Each structure stands twice: as structure tokens, then as C-alpha cells.
């Protein structure tokens, strides 16, 4: 599409070299601004997910609005629909449990990075009692996510409580919500979703 070509040109012309490691001949690239970052991530997502019915960038904006408004049930439905729209042949090379888990990690890392263009995002945030899968912060809400592959949403929610992932937000004036999400390796989408206001 024209917007994708425009994003590609913008990215090619705007990525900057942040560091160079001469021993390993490796470059660390960075984005000069959020617009270039958004264009790059949207282009990668469109290629990786190959959604059939909607544009990735539109879905991301809609998802962020739902999170900004505290509409977690609608966000869960949107996430489930998005994952269900990824063509089955995108998952074709997945043969083992480990590969399935890696596939979900990559998929959600990319989705979360896209959301992070619009709100504050912490992926695999290390805390004193463990590493929380994801914390998304908006102006009025803090969402603490724990993901389980072929587990239960209740187990994910219990981990948030047991590891006290919400402790850093005890004095935060925003509404803090713990969300446990279970994904199915069979359906490749959301299986269960449980949340609790903390």
C-alpha cells in the first residue's frame, strides 16, 4: 500500500546509528522520533501477522483507546479477534511446544511494542520478586499483565498476586488492574481472561 511504501522510505532515511561494536561488526540502530518508530513497527507487524480484514495501525489505535478508557473486556475481545484473523499458515512452521511458546512471545512482543508507541510500556519488567510479563500505563490506568500458554488465567492472576507485581504502584493515584491471560496453542488465540482491580 502507499502508506506502507511511505513508511518504508521514511524509515530507510531516518534510522540512525546509535552505537557500533567494531569487534563484532554490529550496529545498534535507533529511531529519531515516535512517528518513524510507529511506521517501522506497523510495517513489520503487517508483514508478520498478515491480517486479512483490517489494517494493523487502525487496530492498534482502537486498542489503545480501549485501554485509555478502561474498557478491558472490549480490549480482550479486540485482541482475540486480532489473533483469530492471523492466517493459519503463519503458524505453519510451529511443530513443538517450545516453538509455539516462542511464537507467542514474538507475537505478543510485537503487539505490545505497537501499543507502546501510544502509552508507556514495560515488557518483562524485573522487580524484586520476579519479572512481570507486561505493564501498560495510560494517563488514568495501570495494567499489569501476566500471560500463560495453555495454562489458566487464574494461574496468571495468582502469579501477579503471589509475586506482588502491583507493589510499585501502591501509591499511584491511577486505577491499577491485574490481568491474567491464557492463550491456547491449539486455537492460537485468547482462551481465558481474568482481571482484578487492585
Task: Indicate residue ranges for each PLM-predicted region.
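Mg2+/Mn2+-dependent nuclease catalytic core
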Residues: 149-166
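Domain-level recognition of nuclease-like catalytic cores that cleave nucleotide substrates
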Residues: 168, 172-198
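Active-site metal-binding core of divalent-cation-utilizing nuclease and nuclease-like domains
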Residues: 115-139
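Conserved catalytic cores of phosphodiester-cleaving nucleases, focusing on short active-site segments
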Residues: 108, 132-149, 163
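Leucine-rich, amphipathic alpha-helical/linker segments
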Residues: 33-89
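Single conserved hydrophobic/aromatic residue that forms the stacking wall/gate
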Residues: 1-6, 10
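A short, conserved structural fragment
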Residues: 11-20
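Acidic-basic catalytic patches of nuclease active cores, encompassing PD-(D/E)XK
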Residues: 86-121
